[in-house]
Amino acid sequence: IYKVGEEGLLTMESLDHTARIKTFSHDAQTTDSAPSMSAYMTGVKMNNEVLSMSSDTIAEAPLKDANGNKGLTGCASSNGQAVPTLLELAKAQGKAVGAVTTTELTHATPAATYSHICHRDAAYDIAVQAIPNGKGFNTALGDGVDVLMGGGANYWTPYDATNNKRGRADGRDLTAELRSQGYASVTTKAELAAVDPAANSRLIGLFTKDYHLDYDLDRQKNAASTQPSLAEMT
């Protein structure tokens, strides 16, 4: 809008045809991003808060860990079934796959591509589903998601009372586990730019200590920002 002005047309407005769709979830008139992205990934309508599970899955609030941080799954094993995602189907065909986002990597939209869980806020247990050969790994991903980039490093690294108060209470360093399996690991735009794709086909990039990456306008205004743009990540 700033570029074209009030009388100008955005690209979407200049298309030949437009349409309206109903995006209700299985249990609500207004969906949230968990079942909506899950519907894109699986073709299945599910309840609000649920990620890539069957329609009968009930959203169960996540639990707190030993440090009082909310983010552990409260899902009963009998509560619904996982349904295949596009990433899993692509991996089964031998293709490379990735989840790249400017949100936390465990946030509902990216998480729906690689995890199955009854509540979007169980971020600590969402993260482990992306770690090949680790406890909690989503084995439907074969040898794992090839490229993972976003924010929220706290869900992937151990708790520290001074430097990582929202870190993992189980002590696991998921980034170290990925590095041990051949993943390159980066935390800044400069480190990402230095990665040689020919030598590193698998990568995890976590560009914030916690929470999402900055909005693009804020990032552009901050000359000291070390975060990549979505364009630079893709």
Specify the residue positions occupied by each region the protein language model found:
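Long, structured protein-protein interaction/assembly regions in large complexes
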Residues: 220-222
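A glycine- and small/hydrophobic-rich beta-loop-beta segment
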Residues: 234
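Juxtamembrane interface elements at the cytosolic ends of transmembrane helices
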Residues: 110, 217-218
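Membrane-embedded hairpin module used as a gating/binding unit in multi-pass transport
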Residues: 212-214
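N-terminal catalytic scaffold of extracellular/periplasmic and nuclease hydrolases
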Residues: 1-197, 201-202, 209-210, 224-231
